[in-house]
Amino acid sequence: MGDGAEAAGATAASRFGTICVFCGSNAGRRRVFGDAALDLGHELVRRGVDLVYGGGSIGLMGLIARTVLDGGRRVVGVIPRALMAVEISGESVGEVIVVQDMHERKAEMARRSKAFIALPGGYGTMEELLEMITWCQLGIHDKPVGLLNVDGYYDPLLALFDKGEAEGFINSDCRQIFVSAPTASELLTKMEQYTRLHQEVAPATSWEISELGYGRTPGADQS
């Protein structure tokens, strides 16, 4: 961990050694989004958490990655080869794993992480968030999922989830799969306290997803 301000503000170590953060390759039009990415990065460092992210060096991705790396934590970026010229500007941040497609990217990020957080972002960020929620519902993983609702950015999405529950498309227990909060500190505290309440559709070992380690030879690396 880094010294100085980070060390002075240290808190108890998180039970999550590594957290995957989904976020935009754009910074957004308002400073509040960039500030939130920086704050989350500092909070991960304070709690002794390493970062897995989408591998870009621009937008919110670049901000949080540089913050965590500068704080002395490990940063691993996972990026499809086709997006390297688009999402990496100048030097990459931390370690970079190049994959073939978006599915492999998400699976590799999930395999390497103990929890997931979504910062504001566009279609890609929302799709990644929803896939991790769906995988949890199906029983593919049981890792906490957090939504950092910066300045109400995700209020319409949360309202849609509430509508889905009210109309009978989302089970009430599945509505509790993820937690949300307006600040990084509050969100991570909620995630530390998260307990699964929903009934999984099928156990993780019944899913043949080699990228996540299911169906692999026993003893294979699943760090």
Swiss-Prot record:
This is Probable cytokinin riboside 5'-monophosphate phosphoribohydrolase LOGL7. It comes from the Eukaryota. One of its GO terms (cellular component) is nucleus. Keywords: Cytokinin biosynthesis, Hydrolase. Substrate binds at residues 87, 105-106, 122-128, 134. It catalyses: N(6)-(dimethylallyl)adenosine 5'-phosphate + H2O = N(6)-dimethylallyladenine + D-ribose 5-phosphate; 9-ribosyl-trans-zeatin 5'-phosphate + H2O = trans-zeatin + D-ribose 5-phosphate. Cytokinin-activating enzyme working in the direct activation pathway. Phosphoribohydrolase that converts inactive cytokinin nucleotides to the biologically active free-base forms. Belongs to the LOG family. NCBIfam families: Rossman fold protein, TIGR00730 family. The gene is LOGL7. Expressed in roots, leaves, stems, tiller buds, shoot apex, immature inflorescences and flowers. It holds the Pfam family Lysine_decarbox. GO terms for molecular function: cytokinin riboside 5'-monophosphate phosphoribohydrolase activity. GO terms for biological process: cytokinin biosynthetic process. It is an enzyme of class 3 (hydrolase). The lineage of its organism: Eukaryota, Viridiplantae, Streptophyta, Embryophyta, Tracheophyta. The keyword DNA damage does not apply. Coiled coil: none annotated. SUPFAM superfamilies: MCP/YpsA-like. Its EC number is 3.2.2.n1. The keyword Cell division does not apply.
